[in-house]
Amino acid sequence: MEVTRKLIKTLLLVFFMGNLLAYGSNQDPKENSESDATGTEMYRDIEFASQNAILRGRLYLPENKSKKSPVIIMAHGFTTTINGMTADKYAEKYREAGFAVLLYDHRNLGISDGKPRRDVNFWVQSRGYIDCIDFVVTQPEIDASKIAVWGASMSAQEAFLVGSIDERVKAIVTMIPGFESTFPAEDKDGKLYAFAKKAVMSDDIMGMSHTVIEQMPIVSSDQIGTPSVLVEITAYRWFIEYGGRFGTNWNNVVSYSDIETPELYHTGQCAPHLKAPVLMIVATNDEMDGANPEVTYEIYKMVKQPKEWVDIDGGHFGLLHYPSALFDKSSKAQITFLNKYLN
């Protein structure tokens, strides 16, 4: 897969001036438990190992703890973090609906460890989901037979890949998935899927031959003077509004590394290999190049497992605004889907 600035936009799409390189909320990356309106603790801090780094996050537990709970594994989209950038609001909704949630920051981002800081690698992040599952099944409150993976934008593509590899996954939720702007080629002999599976399960993904795009701003209001990875004005507005909030640990800078892949590889080739039902929540008016709804629909048609499609308005970032009617529509559809396949 040729790594270019356009590819970054393609893989990322995001889920998420002074000195743009310094813009962000850079407080001490420390998380604390938090209680709901009734005084019940909503989550506890957790950590687990992945690719020689410690990843950190929150384990949300429902109020009814009389039995083991189904769990949703959540990681945010491109460069975004778990505190204050809307994924935490989705986690709270799932907890209210009776699900446990493990929400964590990807390697190199937020409160998780890993170097180089703010470097994004699709394969390393995908492996993080699998290592997270390894961890969560050891928790006494969790029903290890009822696990869902969740992703938005770039991480939707990661959850999709993981759902084609890990037999423990029983449901897959993808919001505004970033399946790139090109249609997947046919994987006649299954070798492209086999490559992806082998790559994700490698013990040292970063030790594989790879290329790196150096740090640059994620968003910018001045594409001539300070060009950025994401050029859409909606991306700029969302990232600055949500990432700039106190305590997010988000910074407006990113580098991107990618392993060498076969020329025709495309994550959509994993569709026939999914191990579980999938929900796709798709913005039919998505403005991001790498979240082309037509490409997503072609991949949807390739899925052999039970599948559901939900159209949503608001472009790529509409359902990431909280509170909003689009957030409510999205979370309701997800809870209905998860109740069907995890309860």
Language-model regions: role of each:
Residues 160-241:
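Alpha/beta-hydrolase-fold enzymes
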Residues 79-92, 106, 292:
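The serine-hydrolase catalytic nucleophile loop
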Residues 82, 107-144, 324-329:
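Catalytic nucleophile-loop/oxyanion-hole region of alpha/beta-hydrolase
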Residues 93-113:
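Conserved alpha/beta-hydrolase
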Residues 274, 280-282:
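Short beta-strand/loop motif that positions the catalytic acidic residue
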Residues 287-295:
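Conserved alpha/beta-hydrolase "acid-adjacent" motif
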Residues 31-67:
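N-terminal cap/lid segment of alpha/beta-hydrolase-fold proteins
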